[in-house]
Amino acid sequence: MIKIKYSLIYIYFSFLLLIVSTSLFATPNGKDLLLACEHSLDKGFSGTKGMMCTWYVTPCDCFQSEDSEIPRVCLPPVPDVEALAREVTEGLAATPELFNKSADVAAGVILEKSFPCTDEL
């Protein structure tokens, strides 16, 4: 009886550890980005939501390989973060199929239309 009890406790804690470790390494998706950018546009680009929105709407065109799932985006030297956030927010609202993509892929798909990279790597 005691062995069964300890086995159940072990299984329970293993399951909890799996859930916690999965959520610790989860990356934001397009829906998360939409919510963060809507909040940022409404309340200002501060806090974690502001940082998240800014990070994903200003992608760096560095370390992009030809087989990368993340589209290449070439922004101007001094990008307007608010305008980029608005463009990504509108693009996500109009394209809900991007909600389940990672935030960097979703933002890249939207921004590559306005800011394509014309030169080779």
PLM feature spans:
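Absolute protein N-terminus
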Residues: M1, A26-T27
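Bacterial N-terminal signal peptides that target proteins for export
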Residues: I2-Y12
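Domain-scale selection of a single, long terminal region
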Residues: Y12-L16, E66
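N-terminal signal peptide c-region/cleavage motif recognized by signal peptidases
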Residues: S21-S23
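Short N-proximal segments of mature Sec-exported proteins
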Residues: T27-T89, I110
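Short, compact, well-ordered microdomains
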Residues: T89-L121
